[in-house]
């Protein structure tokens, strides 16, 4: 089963613009096959925004920071970054618009929040 899963991943990786993938087959909660680096941390960008937002809100609830904690030099707060109104672009650090004036879909804003959460809690990924 593991060889078949590895072959399947290799086949799909050749057509995708990504260098790595990992997979697993589970049956009744038991892992029966794995392929790829199971310990690698993958940037899943948009897929993780919901889970990330939940994590940030738990941190707010537990007093790690509040929604109005300033995160960037330009004054973007947790609230701004969660709502894509922090002024930062999709992948850029440089501001694209003044904070709070426009919503710009931003993975980078979530990276900033994640970095701050890790530094405040001393918890890794």
Label each PLM-derived region with a short phrase.
Residues 51-54, 108-114:
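Well-ordered alpha-helical segments within folded domains of soluble proteins
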Residues 23-31, 76-112, 123-125:
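Short, charged, amphipathic alpha-helices and their helix-cap/turn boundaries
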Residues 37-39, 66, 98:
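Residue-level signal for pocket-adjacent positions within structured domains
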Residues 10, 114-117:
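Amphipathic alpha-helical segments within well-ordered protein domains
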Residues 4-44, 83:
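A short, well-structured edge-of-sheet supersecondary motif
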Residues 43-47, 51, 59-94, 119-125:
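Active-site helix/loop module of the DD-peptidase/beta-lactamase fold
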């Amino acid at each position: 089963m593991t060889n078949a899963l590895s072959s399947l991943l290799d086949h799909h990786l050749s057509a995708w613009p990504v260098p790595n993938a990992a997979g697993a087959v589970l049956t009744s909660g038991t892992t029966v096959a794995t392929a790829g680096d199971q310990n690698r941390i993958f940037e899943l960008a948009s897929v993780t925004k919901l889970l990330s937002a939940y994590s940030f809100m738990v941190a707010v609830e537990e007093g790690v920071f509040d929604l109005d904690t300033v995160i960037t030099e330009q004054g973007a707060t947790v609230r701004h970054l969660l709502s894509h109104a922090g002024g930062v672009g999709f992948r850029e650090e440089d501001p694209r618009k003044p904070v709070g004036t426009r919503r710009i879909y931003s993975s980078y804003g979530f990276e900033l929040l994640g970095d701050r959460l890790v530094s405040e809690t001393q918890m890794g990924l």
